[in-house]
Amino acid sequence: MEKFPGYLEFDGARQQSFLYPLFFREYIYVLAYDHGLNRLNRNRSFFLENTDYDKKYSSLIVKRLILRMYEQNRLIIPTKDLNQNSFLGHTSLFYYQMISVLFAVIVEIPFSKRLGSSFQGKQLKKSYNLQSIHSIFPFLEDKLAHFNCVLDVLIPYPIHLEILVQTLRYRVKDASSLHFFRFCLYEYCNWKNFDKKKKSILNPRFLLFLYNSHVCEYESIFFFLRKRSSHFRSTSYQVLFERILFYGKIQHFFKVFVNNFPAILGLLKDPFIHYVRYHGRCILATKDTPLLMNKWKYYFVNLWQCYFSLWFQSQKVNINQLSKDNLEFLGYLSSLRLNPLVVRSQMLENSFLIDNVRINLDSKIPISAIIGSLAKDKFCNVLGHPISKATWTDSSDSDILNRFVRICRNISHYYSGSSKKKNLYRIKYILRLCCVKTLARKHKSTVRAFLKRLGSGLLEEFLTGEDQVLSLIFPRSYYASKRLYRVRIWYLDIIYLNDLVNHE
């Protein structure tokens, strides 16, 4: 990046176009396809999520394709001829897939420069588990215990393509880039409607950029209003993108909001609101009354419907009182548990009892949802009874055993922070018996005869897997004690929950 400052500077009047280097510059291809850009993005992985490139995507082919699209009668490709038109040995569907990859590379460069400039002069804390979803659990365990009301919001995604285009319009000043972006999206949807059995032709990197831009637009407005409506200024959210007419729209929104609903704005002022977002959902936690959460619910519905032109039903925003309801978040069912504690105090000759209530965050395992997932993957039936994994019988015995051990170990690590381990033991039992039935089916034997022939040493891998991990954390004497099964152990190395087989 430092070697080509003139080709990456987008602030000049002559270089406002995001696609300007894609049309006219050659150095951007070398930079984008080189591993140097990947190394830069990995260093900035705290704000960008990037995927690797496929070697079959050539930036030179993309440039020739764009030049061909500008020729006469080449701009619109009929849907019925999508699989028939060919260019350089590829079908027309492959064109849009390559364009989506290169488009994501181009638009990420100026955004990464803006984000990098916002962090200049600020010391960032180094963390070795930036991708860990478990890093949120200590926060939930420390903070949610002091709150009593949580607003659970399902973030809607726009179903119309123009909403995504309009969202990018506030950041992208170039009209030609937006028209080109709109053209690719509509061609993709036309092809998808033509053949719904095919998988998506757009690159995951491109789809991830669309989703992040949509969520960033929503969160920037939310945090801006949250900061203005609070007695104390929030400092946790530091990155805000620059957009055209953003502050003018916010002032207009405030003007309409204050004039029409003067009493509601005062009710939104609460400095003790915590915001967490994960996988298309977000929660707002507070220790105030449910009346405040009702006002925030009303705010979310109007924000999505008025600002983003999305039909957002109020049923997608749930108000949970942790003392009564369970909060389903991050694969756990969380609630507040009241533990009464009686303390005897004696002062001189008088003694009296003091009743104290201790509040703990009770995190349970959603056993029904996990059994449903295991049944969907043919590990058991819908009732939780283990069955053999027929698709794995062609593998070797060691491969089958290692797969089951990895799944069981990762589930044990993920749900080790649960306050009740009974459901975790049930899941382990299902996986162990499923492993035995799979091996017995492969060797054309019954489960009893198979276990009798091999002995109990077959299942030692399931039992010693946790021993090797926990012995690195606790002394052997502490591990041998029964207190370990009543302690919450948060593992900070689990990245994917669904990809249990491939995670090492």
Curated annotation (Swiss-Prot):
Main location: plastid
GO biological process: mRNA processing; RNA splicing; tRNA processing
Gene Ontology CC: chloroplast
Top-level taxon of origin: Eukaryota
A Pfam family the protein falls into: MatK_N
Sorted UniProt keywords: Chloroplast, mRNA processing, Plastid, RNA-binding, tRNA processing
Entries under InterPro entries matching the protein: Domain_X, Maturase_MatK, Maturase_MatK_N
Locations listed in the record: Plastid, Chloroplast
One term of GO molecular function: RNA binding
Function summary: Usually encoded in the trnK tRNA gene intron. Probably assists in splicing its own and other chloroplast group II introns.
PANTHER family: MATURASE K
Family listed: Belongs to the intron maturase 2 family. MatK subfamily.
Full protein name: Maturase K
Gene: matK
